[in-house]
Structure formats: C-alpha cells, structure tokens
C-alpha cells in the first residue's frame, strides 16, 4: 500500500452504524426466555419434555451468541472511535509541524 486515505466522516458513520446494529441485536436478544419456556410447557406437557430440554439448551446457546454478536459490534464501534481520535490527533500534530516550517 502506497497511499492511505482516511475520511473521518465515513469512519464516524461506520462507528455509528455499528453502535446501532449492536443496540438492535442486543435488544433482539433480550427476550424473556423463562416466559417462552413456561408457555411451551403448557403446550407440550409431559410428552414433550425431551424436546423442551433440548429447546431450552438451544435457546440459551442462541442468546449467548446474540449477546456475543452485540458485543462485537459495540467493540468495533469503540475501536473505530478510538482509532479515529488517534488519527485526528496525529494528523493535527503533523499539520502543525508542517505549518511551523512554512
């Protein structure tokens, strides 16, 4: 790579998008698993105990995965904001150094 062009506004938008996605995914993962299970027990009863046990495990694993995905988006946003702040500071310092010799 010879040249790298950074457009701060694009990175700000990227960070904001990841915040929004992380929030939406996190909200999707806040279902009331206990209420879902209680409702299903009434439907499946004793006959469906094995299915319900498997479903409860699968749902718990799914919700952990959803939480992890939300955390990845939040982390991506935080890393982008931190990198952009560092870039802006370095860019300003470099510009000041150039101006000082002109």
Residue ranges and their predicted role:
Residues 1-102:
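Amphipathic alpha-helical hairpins/coiled-coils and adjacent low-complexity
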